[in-house]
Amino acid sequence: MSTVKGQTRRERPRGARPHGLTKQKRQEIKEAFDLFDTDNSGTIDAKELNVAMRALGFEMTEEQINQMIADVDKDGSGSIDYEEFEHMMTAKIGERDSKEELTKAFSIIDQDKNGKISDVDIQRIAKELGENFTYQEIQEMVQEADRNGDGEIDFDEFIRMMRRTGYGY
């Protein structure tokens, strides 16, 4: 942390990426912005944004596109500049990456690949991680996450649980 004019700010570790994006990903975002700013206005409107989002791998409805613009359009112009676009894309990429990570984690824990995490799955992964939970503690974990009462944790229940604990997106 450092202090500038009485304000405290967190220092980014040397070599850390701003916004958590790699230089390559930032370049892709800049290229997408430039490519889809077809009128060279320095801004992207809803139509241009829809094309840019598709190029970056996001399928979105017109309503979602309009909401995205409304969320970041500070001046109410109906379009977004590069800084707003980069900020928005950083958030979208973070959401996608988090979901991908949670999907991988679920797959690792769901050893028998039946689409559900059982008490046996939790016991096995806990043992692999060197955690010693009692059977009762494992049952409580399952019950806490098990919304539909089937005694196991499906993917949606897993996501919900991870969001509540701060590990998810």
UniProtKB/Swiss-Prot annotation:
GO molecular function: calcium ion binding
EF-hand domain span: 24-59, 60-95, 97-132, 133-168
One matching Pfam family: EF-hand_7
Keywords tagged on the record: Calcium, Metal-binding, Repeat
The keyword Cell membrane is annotated on this UniProt entry: no
Record-linked InterPro entries: CALM/Myosin/TropC-like, EF-hand-dom_pair, EF_Hand_1_Ca_BS, EF_hand_dom
Residue numbers binding Ca(2+) 1: 37, 39, 41, 43, 48
Biased composition (Basic residues): 15-24
Domain of life according to the entry: Eukaryota
Binding-site residues for Ca(2+) 2, renumbered to this chain: 73, 75, 77, 79, 84
GO cellular component: centriole; nucleus
Binding positions (Ca(2+) 4): 146, 148, 150, 152, 157
Claim: Calcium is one of the keywords in the record: yes
Residues involved in Ca(2+) 3 binding: 110, 112, 114, 116, 121
GO BP of this protein: microtubule cytoskeleton organization
Annotated stretches, region: Disordered: 1-26
Signal peptide feature range: none
The protein's role, per its UniProt record: Potential calcium sensor.
Protein name per its UniProtKB record: Probable calcium-binding protein CML13
Origin species: Oryza sativa subsp. japonica (Rice)
